[in-house]
Amino acid sequence: MTSTVESLSSVKKKISFEIPAERVSAEIEKVFGQIQKRAAIKGFRKGKVPRSLVEQNYRSMMESDVLKNLFDETYFKALADHKIFPVSHPHIESDEVKRGEALKYSATVEVFPEIDVKDYKGLEVKRERFVSDVAPVEARLNEMREGMAELKPLEEGKCAETGNFVVIDFVGSVDGIPFEGGAAESYQLELGSGRFIPGFEDQLVGVKAGEQRTVEVTFPEEYGNKDLAGKAASFAVTVKEAKVKELPELDDEFAMQFGEFETLEQLKTKLAELHKDQETARIKADVQDRIVKALIGNNEIEVPSTLVERQLQMMLSNMKNRLAQQRLSLEMMGMDDESFKTHYRDSAESQVKGSLLLEAVAKKEGITVNDPDVEAKLRAMAEEAGQDFDRVKDFYEQNHNAKENLVAHLNEEKVLGYLLENAVVTEVAKDEL
């Protein structure tokens, strides 16, 4: 067997194989012999079918088995010989399998690009300046107040208004045919929240518990699901409950419900501290993102489409999980899988580029993650979650993928820290970013 490698691009290689005629013929004989033992043709006992009939009736099976066997025998050896580490499954193109003739086939795979990262020191980035502000604290207090609110049934005979809640069953249809993602049961909706298609919530203002109503809407032309965009839809809605929200007073008694506080002022002080921590983390994430974008701007690289697709699939899965927790779906957000991937493809590609470039910097600068780094992170995680350190450590020791992801995250953090230490960072107000 001989194999040669052709670079089709910085991330794609084509391996061409030629298997000698003698080896091909021997494999054909072996495979036909195996098929003959189990071949079933009317008029012959199993295993007693004449060879000529086996070859006549099982030609395609033979070719498939021979190709698979010769592929397994040659492909992985060639990867090792040529030091190729694919990130994708191979795309196979093959000649017809014939006795007495050499077999030529090719395997095209995607690989990691070879990156000579440059201009990663002295990156110029802006960092938002933290400014203390009471408004976010007041907003958080109102959120907590909303969270402690009670939903009580509307007075009998009273109609639901904007700001009230309704619990509904609904089934949506276009031209009388129900569509995917257009139905739910016992869905709680705040009227006026804008969570549904324009016009849907407005038509439920004035309903009463027990009422049935037909809601007519038209999906926006720019709606993410192309099958529904611009189409008129009808929703059969049953109102199971109508509720009004009652908010508690903001006072010391309210603060005491959150455990460690005796006064409202103590609660406000704690919220201010938490807000500062959150803003510091947000600003850090933002400047890290800017560092990565600057790094990408200085290093034009090609990335394997396979890695972009994997990143997109992970983003899609995460989005679906978040929506499911809110009893929502992509369709309710005006998207489907394809429109989501189209919308976020550039973002996914940038994330892949960033990861590969950060890894290249780590390799060039000898930045690594050691056991003390991992232990320190696990201790911080255990403390934050209020869990026993040994229990957290055991979990990661027993879950290889989880630990691998943790180490990768720590490595990126180290590299980003290095880049920031060597960057030209200018602090500016938020509106100057």
Curated annotation (Swiss-Prot):
It is an enzyme of class 5 (isomerase). One of its GO terms (molecular function) is ribosome binding. Residues 163-248 form the PPIase FKBP-type domain. Its EC number is 5.2.1.8. Coiled coil: none annotated. PROSITE patterns: FKBP_PPIASE. InterPro entries: PPIase_dom_sf, PPIase_FKBP_dom, Trig_fac, Trigger_fac_C, Trigger_fac_C_sf, Trigger_fac_ribosome-bd_bac, Trigger_fac_ribosome-bd_sf, Trigger_fact/SurA_dom_sf. GO terms for cellular component: cytoplasm. It is found in: Cytoplasm. The keyword Isomerase applies. GO terms for biological process: 'de novo' cotranslational protein folding; cell division; chaperone-mediated protein folding; protein transport; protein unfolding. Pfam families: FKBP_C, Trigger_C, Trigger_N. NCBIfam families: tig. Involved in protein export. Acts as a chaperone by maintaining the newly synthesized protein in an open conformation. Functions as a peptidyl-prolyl cis-trans isomerase. PANTHER family: TRIGGER FACTOR CHAPERONE AND PEPTIDYL-PROLYL CIS/TRANS ISOMERASE, TRIGGER FACTOR-LIKE PROTEIN TIG, CHLOROPLASTIC. Belongs to the FKBP-type PPIase family. Tig subfamily. Consists of 3 domains; the N-terminus binds the ribosome, the middle domain has PPIase activity, while the C-terminus has intrinsic chaperone activity on its own. This is Trigger factor. The gene is tig.
